[in-house]
């Protein structure tokens, strides 16, 4: 048994911490990993609830196995070197004391539920080589305030960031192709989001319950799943897609939020203009207020009827412009 084991220093020639080595050793509070270690096995430190210090100064660690630090509820930080590639499923599940999730640039894969319920973490850094973010990988990380998904990521898993209720800023880089079901649901503080042109699929209920969400920018040929924005009471969707595009599920906009079809965007992705036609405005009425579009470093000042002109219409007076009018977004630098 390991009931009285408190400090662990491993042999310096060790290259692997084998699966289940310190499983359930609840009294361990300090571990020093040798510099030659390349992998930490499945459940190696599972349930080490007193573990508060992991010392590692090496540069060879490439993989952290499934459940490796599962429920290590007293671990405030962990340095994993700069060679780490794979983080297994549930690897840091419920590490509620973890203050920052600062992943080395070498990381490529983040397994399902890897940092699920790390409710103490206030910052997250994803490096430029992450290709896949697993299902629920960062779900219920309730102290995160911003999330930036790099261009290397191809897919964001189901529920990946669900319940990250403090996130106000979400950046999704060009390159991301798929966003899973409920991936960003219940992000109650999120105020706006611009989806990249590279995105081919937005999953069911991906932004469901984002109750503070205003402007949503959808560019390119994105297939949108059922209830994608359900319950997003202040959302307005700005898209360059046509009204009759066939790649949206029937109930993609099941909360009947305002949609502006056929928008023209700049290369940087901000709104330039919009033409009022019989089908370009959907669900714009007195009880369905239009949220202003968003541009970094600027505030939206209204709609002009000539390019570079002064604002003639307020954001929610779109419906008053005659059919055939092209409206130009007026931006004021902050």
What are these regions (language model features)?
Residues 2-16, 26-39, 49-63, 73-86, ...:
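Structural signature of tandem-repeat unit edges
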Residues 32, 78-79, 265-334:
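Secondary-structure capping and domain/repeat boundary segments
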